Amino acid sequence: QEQGTNPSQEQNVPLPRNYKQALETNTPTKTSWPELVGVTAEQAETKIKEEMVDVQIQVSPHDSFVTADYNPKRVRLYVDESNKVTRTPSIG
């Protein structure tokens, strides 16, 4: 080791200060998109993928039945006959 270097200073990554911060570092910052109600499915998908890159978008008719399983990488878009989002898209 060279004189004057300190290996502990090579990685200056701040640690979480509390339990809540530790949990938040692994979860998306946004879990729903109420501002997308009324836009087309394509516009909503584009906006969501800008904020959550590895998301799977599932488009369904607003009156359809879907499985009740929770998927943290999925956002469902419920659309009407004109392909406009009718419910707030959210993770699940």
UniProtKB/Swiss-Prot annotation:
GO BP annotations listed: response to wounding
Function according to Swiss-Prot or TrEMBL: Inhibitor of subtilisin.
GO MF annotation terms: serine-type endopeptidase inhibitor activity
Protein name as annotated: Subtilisin inhibitor 1
Compositional bias segments (type: Polar residues): 1-12
Keyword DNA repair part of the UniProt annotation: no
Family according to the record: Belongs to the protease inhibitor I13 (potato type I serine protease inhibitor) family.
Organism: Phaseolus angularis
